[in-house]
Structures are given as structure tokens and as C-alpha cells.
Design a protein with these regions (language model features):
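Transmembrane alpha-helices and their membrane-interface boundaries in multi-pass membrane transporters
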Residues: 395-409, 431-450, 457-499, 605, ...
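Transmembrane helices with small-residue packing motifs
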Residues: 12, 19-55, 113-123, 377, ...
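Solvent-exposed, membrane-proximal periplasmic/extracellular interface segments of envelope transport
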Residues: 58-130, 191-212, 233, 571-653, ...
Length: 992
């Protein structure tokens, strides 16, 4: 007695098992988290260290190199990159996916703490954070007021909003864009300082000595103990202005005599506006692998709670929210599930033309789909685009077994058999075929388990959900379906009018198919040239179809990065960015929001469009219009960017090609030639390189002999320049219970030309004032403003956007050609960002494709105990793949991970249909029929079930192939590949 017979004999048992599947599936659905994609973020740890006033070369040698040297030994590192720039070093450590984030963070902290003894004493301690320093924020809260200054808004954002949001689970950091943090600015006048014989170092020492509060002990009496507190801290600009610096001829010299103190912003070279209104933005950056929707929901909840804490004249809004696209995309896929379900039911009814027979698959489909959520739950997955796509694909797959089982039982009932016996006999005949098709479909997805990197993580969840759905549907088909069939199906004495009207069509179809099959079986040799033609078509089209990681999606967001020539002032880049902002306003006046942000050297404009349903143009069209328009804005450079599907880095182009060399001189020599070839290549647009050699600098060459003779040391000179010009922190002060910086610097009006520096004085060891011009020589030069390392090599990353119609695969091929023409054997090349993910996913998907073919062949061989029968089935695979490629080429679909996974699915779908015919043919041969007759009978008998299941699969995927709304392009890619492959293969499969 098999499980089908047991279920027929014990219907309550079969019903209970089905209810348990439904119950567990519903519980799983209600407890699963929601996100856009499976967690595919590599663990990334960032190390930052500040050293005010130091240039890139000093930062690289004294900070970056010691830190990198120690970090490099940590196991599991995928890439180690760094940037050394004026006053700061940033190191990004990317680990393999298998490494735990907390373990990685602890390892990095340990290595950084060991390296600290090699760092300069007066640099800030390095900070370690669990996120990429360039990670994209998922949400921005805009804080605005008509009556308050940006200083006040920044304080509210910091003390009220940021404090609350950074405690949300899985948030890596909360930053304030456009922040004007309070500081005590000490503006120095070099002329007055020279007159009073005071240097910037004297001011620093006075601050250190006069702004201090140390523990002072206590007074202990017999009955009372009093704690002493020395009130040495200063809190107001007036107190700082009154600091006594020295006494000259009986006259006290205060700070107000050589400058002035004011409460002002620490960062005076930045601003931020949203829709033209100055504001500050609180942005939330998630940890790698975090659930973005849960974080966004928590932010909304916290902001609602904070309403009562904000002043009445302070308003907040959401500048952007990336989770809107995620929610809409998931909702679109969910609606696709319902559409697919309805279409599948319609096709089943059109074929069976009996509501009782149709009712059985209608009941079985939800069992398999709901059960899939239990598979997600026990595997620790989430509801995301890929798991929901798996559910959509399952609609067409899970119905197959139910249709085949129901149809086989129904035929026997129509022949006069009692439902009970028909159920047992029909289930027994089809039992092995159902098991075989299930194993075959599951085997298709087994290779995905072995895939590494981003693509492996992405489609592991997809494959498990499809495989789980198919296994559950197979179980339901072998238990619940035959039981239902024996209860619902009856022999009709007279068929309904719809059946009678349509039966001639099906009988005619059978006759035409029988004639075609007989004709082809007499000319079986034609199968070989047809297969060869299809293989040639595959070879040609595979090379013609452009490849990329994932199709670009309309996320209703565009970003424009602006950059000026090296050495350009903050005001210059600010004016250029505002010019681009005005241009954007003229091109898309109905944008939901336009946020402009500028800091020294660069700017960014983030455009948030209306929802897709509220506009009649696409994000890509707007991006192209802006790209064309900004070409006329030549004062500086602007780069239009659109976020990739799997990109998490801010401001990164799709093509990221890294050149590595042993010395910066070699890079300086080859970069101009390399870049000129990239600029001339029509594949690229908006190309740029991060390593520049054109930043103007003034080198101070010290005459050591002269300085020594006059009693001045190199430290005296360096500290005077450091505290006078770099904006170095001189200490801290407290206001409203919070700590802020004290920043000293010479007035900008008195340090805006090289000649101003010559008038600065230093004090010798004899107490004499010496003009700096007497000890040093000023030489104008150029140097890189930023120095880059990639995997410990000095590097330069060439970034490029892609011309309209070009893909990342074509871009990387062109980069490889340029590198071969330009670089010698001492150079290395590497990929970064989306380019690296694409290259890794391409190789692993090809491996999965080949392994799927081998596994299915071996499994079929084991099932049929023959190496020949599986080969017959496998010959139909090229038909499906060729069909998929033809439809993709005609529809302009790229070869991406979505279309490729659809092609891998086709292998199982086509093999499944082949099993049904070959299995029945073998059974008939065992029953005594000759080979050719067995083939004819099996093909004719399985014609309707195969057409029905194939049509169900195709119609179940039609909503994907014609998808609209958020996330449509990836659904179209997968749907087109599977639908195209099924349509072409079914035309030829039933004959071949």
C-alpha cells in the first residue's frame, strides 16, 4: 500500500496532514520579516582616524600604513581599501560573506588598538564602526524651521532626534547632513599678535592652562564632608575674550586684543537645502544585512513619539525613504501571485471543462503556496522580492502534479470505474512519474546551493522556496489530491454544453498531433539537425545578448555628484552645485523633493521623483535628459547616477576598475593614456579617476641651519603653522551639559594669499619674535589630494557610467582591452563594487548551469535505469534555452541573474514533461507494446496533461513577463526567459 492508497482509504488522515501544512504556513507568514532582497551584504568594518592639518602624504605614512599593516593579517578579508586625505584617513575592510559581523568587528578593534602606539600622539583615536563609510542611508528626516538658525536646528537634531534614532536595533550610525555644530571659534589676527609678541602656540597654551577643571578633593569635618570643585571651565565667548595671554609693560594682554572669540559653527564649509530651503538632515545608515523595513518602521514610530519633544516652530519631514520602493515592489509581486493563480485556474477549467475537476487543483495550489512560507520560516528566510518570485513561479509548477493525478483518475471514472478504485489505480500508475518529476525539479536548484558570493546568497532562498513548494505539492498530489478526487469526481451521464461545444476542438487537436507525430517518427533523423540549429542559435545569441548583474530599476531617485578642479574653493563648488540645482528644477518641476548638499570640494543633489503611478515618464528618461543638459555646464563636472539593484555604496558608478602599482610614480605615468582611451570609448560616459595629481599645495622648506642659529626648532615652526592655519582643536568647552570643540585659526581675510603666511611670527628660545619668512622658503607645487590603497597596493580606481544601451559586462570587456594595451606586467588590475559582484556572479552562475545539466542527467539515468532514455529527454533542453534567448533578444532583455535563473529553471521544466512521456512509454513497452507504438500511445495519452501543465506554467508567469510598477524589470527578465523557453520548446518538444 503506497501513500496515495493510504490517503484514499483514510481521508481524515490526508485532510489533517493538509490542515497542518496550512496552519504552519500561516504561522510562518505572520512571523516572517519583510525586506527587498535576502541578506547579501558582506560584513564591512570601517576605521576612521582624524589628524587635523595633516596632508594626504603624512596621513598615508603615519596613520594609514601602520593601521593597514596590522589589519591585513585578519583572516577572511575579501578586500582592504583605504583613502588618505587632508586631515583624515578612512580604511574599509570587507569580509567574506561567511564571516560573522561581530567577530569581524572585534578582530579589527583588536588590531587597531595594537597599532595605536605607532600613530602620532596628537591625532584623534581611531574609531571602528560596523558599516561601510560610503554606505547609502536608507532614510532621511529633514529638520526645518522658519525662525531658528541652522546652529539651533543642528543642536535639536543632535540632542533630540539623533539620540533617539541611533538606539534602534541594527542601525550602524546616524549622521547629520548639513550639520552646523556649535564650537567656540577663536579668530586670530597675525598683525596684532606680532605687535604684542604672541604666537598661535601661546594661545593654545593659554587655553590649556585657563580652561581646565580637575578633581579637587574634599574637606572632611567631624559631621560633614564637603566635596571641592574648582570652577575652571569657560562657557561663553565673553570669558574666552577675557583670557589673559601675557603682561607687557604693566599692561595685561587679553585674547580680545589679538583676535576675538565667537560661538559659531565648527564646519563653515558646508550647507544643505531641500527644495531651496536651508535645513539639516538626519540620515539613518543600517548595518550590513539589516532589515531596512523594520528600521524604517522604527524610525517612523520614534519620530511620532518625539513630536512632543520638538519645539512648536520646528517641523520635520522625510527627505527620502528607500523602503518605499521595497514595500511597493513586494506588493507588486504579491499581486502577481493572485493574478497568476486566477490565470492558472482559468486554463485548467478550459482544458478540463468541469468545475468538480477544476476545484481539486484550486484547493491544492494554496496548500503548496502557503506551505512554502513554513519552509521560509524554518530556514530563517524573509519575505522578499526573490522569495515572492519563487512563490509566483510555484503557482505554475505546483499545479502540475495535481493536474496529472486528477486527470489520470478522471479518465478512469469516465471509462466507468468506481471513484474509489479509479483513485487507487490512477494514483498507482502516476506515482513514480510524480516522484520523478519532483526529484528532477528539486535537482535543478541543488547546484545553486554551491554558488558562492552575492548571487549564491541571493538565489539560495529562491531555490529553497521553489524546491520546498514543489516537494509540498508532490506530497499533496500523492495524498490530498487522490482523496479529493474520489470524493468529488463522478461519472457524468451527459456532458455540459460547454464541454460539447469545445470537445471537437480537442479531438481535432489530438488528430493533428497524431498525424504530425506519425510523420515525424518516419523521419526521425530530422531531430538531429533541429537540435544542431538550436545549439547554433544558443551560441550566437548568448554572445549577442548584453550581460549585467541586474537590470536597472525605476526607484524614483536620481543622484548628481558635482566636483570641481582640485584646489577650487568651497564657494566655487557651492555656486556650481546651485546652478545644477536650478537646472534640475527647470527640467523636472514636479519632483517630489530636490535636496542639495555641499561640502568642501564636492556636492551632491538627490532628486526624489513622484511615485511611478503618478508620473508618465521613467527615472531613466529623466536621468538621460539631465545628463544631456549638464554637458553645457563646464565650470566643473557633474555625474548623474542611478542606484543599482544590489548597490549599497553612495556615489559609485557601475564600472569600477582598479589599477594597482608598486609606486605612485608609475600610476602617474600611465593614467593619462589610460583615461584618454576610456574617454574616447563610446561604451562609457562620465568617466573619472579618483587619484588626482593636480591639487595645488604650498610646500614650506625649512632652512634648518638658519633656524638653529636663530634659536627656532622645526617643532616651533610646525606648531605655529598648525595652530594658526589648520583650524586645530585647542580644547573643549561645555554648554548646556554638552561638550563642544574650541577651534583656533587666523582670520580668512589674513590667510587668503601665500604672502599672508610670510607675516606670521614665531618665538625663538631667547624670547625673540622671528618672522617666518626669515626661516623658510615657500615653493608652489601640485600633489595628490587623496591617496588610495587597494589590498595594500597603491591604487587608482577608474569609474565610469555606461552609455545608453550598454551593460556592465560590455564595459568590463572594454576596460580589459584598454588595460592590455596600456599597462605593463608590473601592474595589477582588480574590480570593485558592482563590477566585482557581477564578475563573481557570472562565473558562479555558469557553474550552476552546467552542474544542473549533469545532475538532472544522472538523476534521470538512475530513475530509468538507462543512460539512453535520459539523453532523449536532455535533447529537448536546447529547444527551451534557444527559445528563452530568442525572446530575450527580441525583447531587449539583458543576460542578468534574474534571466539566468529563469534559464536554469527551464532545464527542470522541460525535463519534467519528458519524464511523463518516457515513463508512460516504458510502462507500455513493459506491457507488451512495441517501441514505436508505445511512443505513439504515450505521447497521445499525455498530450493534454502536458499541454495543460505547460500552459499553466506559462500563464502563471505571464504576469511576470508583462509586469509594471516598482521592480518590474527584474520580473520581466525572469518571466520572459521562462515563458519564451516554454513556448518554443512546447512547439517542438511533443514531436522531438
Amino acid at each position: 500500500m503506497n501513500i496515495s492508497e493510504l490517503s484514499i482509504r483514510r481521508p481524515v488522515l490526508a485532510t489533517v496532514l493538509t490542515i497542518i501544512i496550512l496552519l504552519f504556513g500561516l504561522i510562518g507568514y505572520n512571523t516572517l520579516g519583510v525586506r527587498e532582497y535576502p541578506s547579501v551584504d558582506n560584513p564591512i568594518i570601517s576605521v576612521t582616524c582624524s589628524y587635523s592639518g595633516a596632508n594626504a602624504d603624512v596621513i598615508e605614512n603615519q596613520i594609514t600604513e601602520p593601521l593597514e599593516q596590522n589589519i591585513n593579517g585578519i583572516p577572511g578579508i575579501r578586500s582592504l581599501s583605504s583613502v588618505s586625505q587632508q586631515g583624515q584617513c578612512r580604511i574599509t575592510v570587507e569580509f567574506e560573506l561567511s564571516v560573522d559581523l561581530e567577530t569581524a568587528a572585534n578582530d579589527v578593534r583588536d588590531k587597531v588598538s595594537r597599532a595605536q602606539r605607532y600613530l602620532p600622539r596628537d591625532c584623534d583615536p581611531p574609531t571602528v564602526s560596523k558599516a561601510d563609510a560610503d554606505a547609502t542611508p536608507i532614510l532621511m528626516v529633514a529638520i526645518q524651521s522658519d525662525s531658528r538658525s541652522l546652529l539651533e536646528l543642528s543642536e535639536i537634531a543632535d540632542l533630540t532626534v539623533k539620540e533617539q534614532l541611533q538606539t534602534i536595533s541594527d542601525v550602524s550610525s546616524v549622521s547629520i547632513w548639513g550639520e552646523k555644530r556649535y564650537s567656540m571659534r577663536l579668530w586670530l589676527d597675525p598683525t596684532k599678535m606680532a605687535g604684542y609678541g604672541i604666537t598661535p602656540v601661546d594661545v593654545k597654551n593659554a587655553i590649556t592652562n585657563e580652561n581646565i577643571e580637575l578633581p579637587s578633593g574634599s574637606i572632611e569635618g567631624n559631621t560633614v564632608e564637603l566635596t571641592l570643585r574648582t570652577m575652571g571651565q569657560m562657557h561663553t565667548a565673553k570669558e574666552f575674550n577675557n583670557i589673559i595671554l601675557k603682561e607687557v609693560g604693566g599692561r595685561v594682554v587679553r585674547f580680545s586684543d589679538i583676535g576675538y572669540a565667537e560661538l559659531g559653527p565648527a564646519d563653515i564649509k558646508s550647507y544643505m537645502k531641500m527644495n531651496g530651503v536651508p535645513m539639516v538632515g538626519v540620515v539613518v545608515i543600517p548595518q550590513p544585512g539589516a532589515n531596512h523595513i523594520e528600521i524604517a518602521d522604527a524610525v517612523y514610530q520614534r519620530m511620532e513619539q518625539m513630536k512632543k519633544d520638538l519645539p512648536d516652530d520646528v517641523k520635520y519631514s522625510y527627505g527620502f525613504d528607500n523602503t518605499k520602493f521595497i514595500r511597493a515592489s513586494i506588493d507588486e509581486v504579491k499581486s502577481t501571485v493572485y493574478e497568476a493563480f486566477v490565470l492558472v485556474i482559468i486554463i485548467i477549467f478550459l482544458f478540463l471543462r468541469d468545475w468538480r475537476v477544476t476545484l481539486i487543483p484550486c484547493i491544492v495550489i494554496p496548500v503548496s503556496l502557503i506551505g512554502a512560507f513554513f519552509v521560509m520560516y524554518i530556514a530563517g528566510f524573509s519575505i522578499n522580492v526573490l522569495t515572492m518570485l519563487a512563490v509566483v513561479l510555484s503557482v505554475g509548477l505546483v499545479v502540475d502534479d495535481a493536474i496529472v493525478m486528477t486527470e489520470n483518475i478522471y479518465i478512469r471514472i469516465e471509462r466507468g470505474m468506481r471513484p474509489f478504485e479509479a483513485g487507487i489505480e490512477g494514483a498507482k500508475e502516476i506515482f513514480f512519474a510524480v516522484i520523478s518529476t519532483t526529484i528532477t525539479l528539486v535537482a535543478v536548484f541543488l547546484p545553486i546551493v554551491f554558488m558562492e558570493g552575492t548571487s549564491g546568497r541571493l538565489f539560495r532562498e529562491f531555490s529553497f522556496v521553489v524546491a520546498g513548494s514543489v516537494i509540498i505539492s508532490s506530497f499533496a498530489a500523492l495524498t490530498f489530491t487522490p482523496m479529493l478526487a474520489t470524493k468529488l469526481l463522478i461519472k457524468r451521464e451527459k456532458q455540459g454544453w460547454f464541454y460539447q461545444k469545445t470537445e471537437p476542438f480537442f479531438e481535432g487537436m489530438n488528430r493533428i498531433y497524431a498525424r504530425s507525430l506519425n510523420a515525424f517518427l518516419k523521419r526521425r533523423i530530422w531531430a538531429i539537425p533541429v537540435t544542431v540549429i538550436m545549439l547554433i542559435a544558443i551560441g550566437v545569441l548568448w554572445g549577442q545578448i548584453p550581460a549585467e548583474m541586474a537590470p536597472m530599476e525605476d526607484r524614483s531617485q536620481i543622484s548628481i555628484n558635482t566636483r570641481a578642479a582640485e584646489g577650487a574653493s568651497y564657494e566655487y563648488i557651492r555656486d556650481y552645485t546651485e546652478d545644477i540645482n536650478n537646472l534640475v528644477d527647470s527640467i523636472i518641476p514636479d519632483a517630489e523633493s530636490v535636496t542639495a548638499r555641499v561640502s568642501s570640494g564636492s556636492g551632491n543633489i538627490r532628486i526624489t521623483l513622484k511615485d511611478i503611478k503618478d508620473r508618465d515618464y521613467t527615472q531613466m528618461e529623466v536621468a538621460e535628459r539631465i545628463s544631456q543638459a549638464i554637458r553645457n555646464k563646464t565650470k566643473a563636472r557633474a555625474f548623474v547616477q542611478q542606484q543599482s539593484s544590489f548597490g549599497g555604496r553612495r556615489g559609485s558608478m557601475p564600472v569600477q576598475y582598479v589599477l594597482q602599482a608598486v609606486s605612485i610614480e608609475k600610476l602617474e605615468k600611465v593614467l593619462p593614456d589610460f583615461l584618454s582611451k576610456v574617454y574616447d570609448n563610446p561604451t562609457f560616459q562620465m568617466a573619472d579617476v579618483d587619484l588626482k595629481f593636480s591639487s595645488p599645495e604650498m610646500r614650506v622648506n625649512i632652512n634648518r641651519d638658519k633656524a638653529g642659529t636663530m634659536g627656532a626648532t622645526v617643532r616651533d615652526i610646525a606648531e605655529t603653522l598648525q595652530y594658526g592655519l589648520s583650524g586645530q582643536r585647542m580644547g573643549y568647552f561645555y554648554m548646556n551639559g554638552k561638550q563642544y570643540e574650541i577651534l583656533g585659526q587666523i582670520n580668512r581675510q589674513q590667510r587668503n594669499t601665500p604672502a599672508n603666511i610670510k607675516s606670521i611670527y614665531i618665538r625663538s628660545d631667547k624670547g625673540e619674535m622671528i618672522q617666518l619668512d626669515n626661516l623658510v622658503e615657500f615653493v608652489e607645487s601640485v600633489a595628490p589630494p587623496k591617496l588610495y590603497h587597494y589590498n595594500r597596493f597603491i591604487s587608482a580606481t577608474v569609474s565610469a557610467g555606461l552609455a545608453d544601451g550598454k551593460t556592465i559586462g560590455q564595459g568590463l570587456e572594454e576596460m580589459d582591452k584598454i588595460a592590455a594595451q596600456t599597462l605593463d606586467e608590473t601592474f595589477r588590475t582588480a574590480l570593485s563594487g558592482d563590477s566585482k559582484d557581477y564578475r563573481e556572479s557570472s562565473s558562479s552562475l555558469m557553474f550552476a548551469f552546467i552542474l544542473a545539466l549533469i545532475l538532472i542527467y544522472l538523476i534521470l539515468a538512475a530513475q530509468f535505469e538507462s543512460f539512453k532514455d535520459p539523453f532523449i529527454i536532455m535533447l529537448t533542453v536546447p529547444l527551451a534555452i534557444a527559445g528563452a534567448l530568442i525572446f530575450m533578444y527580441a525583447g531587449g532583455i539583458t543576460m542578468n541573474i534574474f534571466s539566468q535563473i529563469g534559464i536554469i529553471m527551464l532545464i527542470g521544466l522541460v525535463a519534467k514533461n519528458g519524464i511523463l512521456i518516457v515513463e508512460f512509454a516504458n510502462q507500455k513497452q513493459e506491457g507488451g507494446e512495441n517501441k514505436m507504438q508505445a511512443i505513439r500511445d504515450a505521447a497521445l495519452q499525455r498530450l493534454r496533461p502536458i499541454l495543460m501543465t505547460s500552459a499553466s506554467t506559462v500563464l502563471g508567469l505571464i504576469p511576470l513577463a508583462f509586469a509594471t510598477g516598482e521592480g518590474a524589470n527584474q520580473r520581466i527578465a525572469m518571466g520572459t526567459a521562462v515563458v519564451g523557453g516554454m513556448l518554443v520548446s512546447m512547439r517542438l518538444f511533443l514531436i522531438l
